[in-house]
Regions:
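Terminal substrate-recognition subdomain of acyl/acetyltransferases
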Residues: 3-106, 111, 216-278
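Nucleic-acid nuclease catalytic cores
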Residues: 182, 186, 190-197, 213-226
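Conserved acetyl-CoA-binding loop-helix of GNAT-fold acetyltransferases
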Residues: 195-207
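A conserved beta-strand-loop-helix scaffold within acyl/acetyltransferase catalytic domains
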Residues: 67-76, 82-195, 235
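Residue-level preference for non-acidic, small/hydrophobic
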Residues: 56, 122, 203-206, 233
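Conserved acyl-CoA
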Residues: 59, 204-216
Length: 278
C-alpha cells in the first residue's frame, strides 16, 4: 500500500457518509518499465461496506484493509483485474500433476486473525520473493492490521502439510467472500518448497472452494499482458479481465496499453456504479 493510502486510513474518522473517490500521486510502476502508476481509491466503512465491496470488486477494484482501489493511470490501462469462472475452469495436465503432488495438504478455513506462524511465513516469503518491495519493512503490527482490519466478510485460508510427524503451515491466503465469488486479497507460501508449486496449487484449490460454496468466480488480482510477474495467471483458462467497463476473455486483449485515460475529459477513467442506496 502506498503512503497516500496509509495516511488516508488514518484520516478515516473525518470521512463523509457517501463514498468519495481520490487519486494518489504518481509513482514508479512496479510492472512496466518507464511507466508511472496512480490509484483511484475510496474508504470502505460503515453499514454498507459489504455491498460496496461487492459492487466495486465487479468493477475492477481491490481491497487493502479498509480501502478499495483500482489503477487510474494517465497514460496507461495495462493493469486489469482478473478472475476465473469456477465452473468453466478445467485444470490442465500440469495443474492436475500439481494437485496430485499436493494431495497430502490440509486446508483450514479460519476467521481473519493473525498468528505468529503466519507472520513468520510472511517474512520468509517476502525476504525470498520481494526483498525490495513495499511490504519488506512490515513489522508484526503492520501484518496484523493487514489481516484483521476488515469490515467485510473475510477469511484466512490456511494450508498445512506434515513435517516430522506434525502439521506445519506452508501457505495461506487472505480472502473476501463476495456475493459472486472469492477474492484473493493476499497470498503467501513457503518459497523453499518449489517442487510443490504452491502458488498454482492455492489458486486451483480456491477454485474448488468456490465450487463448494456455489460461488461463480475466483478474483485473482491484477494482470498485465506481457509482464513476467503476471504470466502465471494466464495459465488459468479461461481467464477474464475487466477492461473498458466490462469483463472479457484475456485472449482478446491485443496489447499492454489499449486505451490511455484522457484526463481532460474523464478524470477517473471508466464509469463507477455504486449500490443503489449509496
Amino acid at each position: 500500500m502506498t503512503l497516500n493510502l496509509r495516511l488516508f486510513l488514518a484520516m478515516r474518522h473525518t470521512l463523509p457518509q457517501n463514498p468519495q473517490f481520490y487519486v494518489t500521486a504518481p509513482q514508479d510502476c512496479p510492472y512496466l518499465d518507464n511507466q508511472v502508476e496512480r490509484k483511484l481509491f475510496t474508504a470502505l466503512y460503515g453499514t454498507n461496506s459489504r455491498r460496496l465491496n461487492n459492487s466495486l470488486s465487479k468493477q475492477g477494484f481491490r481491497r487493502s484493509q479498509n480501502v478499495l482501489y483500482r489503477p487510474s493511470c494517465a497514460n496507461c490501462s495495462a493493469c486489469m483485474s482478473a478472475r476465473i469462472s469456477s465452473s468453466e475452469f478445467k485444470p490442465s495436465k500440469s495443474q492436475k500433476r500439481i494437485l496430485s503432488k499436493n494431495s497430502d495438504i490440509v486446508r483450514v478455513v479460519n476467521p481473519p486473525l493473525a498468528t505468529d506462524a503466519q507472520y513468520n511465513l510472511f517474512k520468509k516469503y517476502i525476504t525470498a520473493r520481494h526483498p525490495n518491495g513495499g511490504m519488506s519493512d512490515m513489522d508484526a503490527d503492520d501484518f496484523t492490521a493487514m489481516i484483521e482490519e476488515t469490515n467485510v466478510e473475510s477469511k484466512l485460508i490456511e494450508y498445512y502439510a506434515k513435517k516430522n510427524g506434525e502439521l506445519e503451515l506452508i501457505s495461506f491466503s487472505l480472502v473476501d467472500i463476495l456475493d459472486d465469488g472469492i477474492s484473493m486479497v493476499y497470498s503467501v507460501f513457503n518459497p523453499y518448497l518449489k517442487e510443490r508449486s504452491l502458488g498454482t496449487y492455492m489458486i486451483i484449490d480456491h477454485n474448488r472452494l468456490a465450487l463448494e460454496m456455489t460461488l461463480k468466480f475466483v478474483y485473482l488480482g491484477y494482470w498485465v499482458k506481457g509482464s513476467s510477474k503476471m504470466d502465471y495467471k494466464k495459465r488459468f483458462i479461461p481467464l477474464e479481465v475487466f477492461t473498458e467497463d466490462k469483463w472479457i476473455c484475456s485472449t482478446k486483449v491485443r496489447q499492454a496499453r489499449p486505451n490511455p485515460v484522457n484526463d481532460s475529459k474523464e478524470k477517473l477513467g471508466v464509469p463507477i456504479y455504486l449500490p443503489s442506496d449509496q
